[in-house]
Amino acid sequence: MAAVSVYERPVGGFSFDNCRRNAILEADFAKKGYKLPTARKTGTTIAGVVYKDGIVLGADTRATEGMVVADKNCSKIHFISPNIYCCGAGTAADTDMTTQLISSNLELHSLSTGRLPRVVTANRMLKQMLFRYQGYIGAALVLGGVDVTGPHLYSIYPHGSTDKLPYVTMGSGSLAAMAVFEDKFRPEMEEEEAKQLVSEAIAAGIFNDLGSGSNIDLCVISKSKLDFLRPYSVPNKKGTRFGRYRCEKGTTAVLTEKVTALDIEVLEETVQTMDTS
């Protein structure tokens, strides 16, 4: 019996069905004069630095909704565990829910092991979760903490990649903040020096990026203490008015005046009460 060989195209691991669907939707919307929604730019400046005895994390407090300032004093430094905190940039809902979920899982891990969690454990949980969602969770994070092995600082990207560095910045104002770090960072800094450096880095992001603004929050973590400084400084303090800037009536000359009579149609309405007896 002759064998029948039928060629079958190998099935790849990626499905392009949604790509074809999006192309059809885009063509259909274009006929009606509509455009598909585009990715929305988010704005934030977050940073962290390792000093001699621990970690200093910093963030601005402006939340934006497109080109509108939605909140002037939101907190972007999230609790993970008593010895670990995390700064979040990107989509506010994603950063909030992601850090809350990891904080809960880390508390269960701590109860199971009977000791404080390590920073590398939180980093592994975050990177595995974000990689699983392939970047669709818009959470760019700066994770910092102190455990039995010393201070640790990580940057975690939305796709799941991570870096361990002595100083990190993320967000739309990260370039300005990184310029300050590369100019003034040095190893084995004292706490006050580290706080001042992070404050200057966040201020650089605030003054050079429209998506960052308002106040500067800091979180200082060491083996002996935890300081949450909110706000640490207010670089954009509103000025005080020293006088009344109102012109008296008649100050501006009226060059021409035209009065147009309007035809108004008056309608009369009567309401008849309903007999309920």
Swiss-Prot record:
One of its GO terms (cellular component) is nucleus. Residues 1-43 form a propeptide. CDD domains: proteasome_beta_type_7. GO terms for biological process: proteasome-mediated ubiquitin-dependent protein catabolic process. Keywords: Cytoplasm, Hydrolase, Nucleus, Protease, Proteasome, Threonine protease, Zymogen. Its EC number is 3.4.25.1. The active site is at 44 (nucleophile). Gene3D superfamilies: Glutamine Phosphoribosylpyrophosphate, subunit 1, domain 1. It catalyses: Cleavage of peptide bonds with very broad specificity. It is found in: Cytoplasm; Nucleus. One of its GO terms (molecular function) is endopeptidase activity. InterPro entries: Ntn_hydrolases_N (IPR029055), Pept_T1A_subB (IPR000243), Proteasome_bsu_C (IPR024689), Proteasome_bsu_CS (IPR016050), Proteasome_sua/b (IPR001353), Proteasome_suB-type (IPR023333). Disulfide bonds: none annotated. The keyword Protease applies. Component of the 20S core proteasome complex involved in the proteolytic degradation of most intracellular proteins. This complex plays numerous essential roles within the cell by associating with different regulatory particles. Associated with two 19S regulatory particles, forms the 26S proteasome and thus participates in the ATP-dependent degradation of ubiquitinated proteins. The 26S proteasome consists of a 20S proteasome core and two 19S regulatory subunits. The 20S proteasome core is a barrel-shaped complex made of 28 subunits that are arranged in four stacked rings. The two outer rings are each formed by seven alpha subunits, and the two inner rings are formed by seven beta subunits. The proteolytic activity is exerted by three beta-subunits PSMB5, PSMB6 and PSMB7. Belongs to the peptidase T1B family. PANTHER family: METALLOPROTEASE TLDD, PROTEASOME SUBUNIT BETA TYPE-7. This is Proteasome subunit beta type-7. It comes from Sus scrofa (Pig). The lineage of its organism: Eukaryota, Metazoa, Chordata, Craniata, Vertebrata.
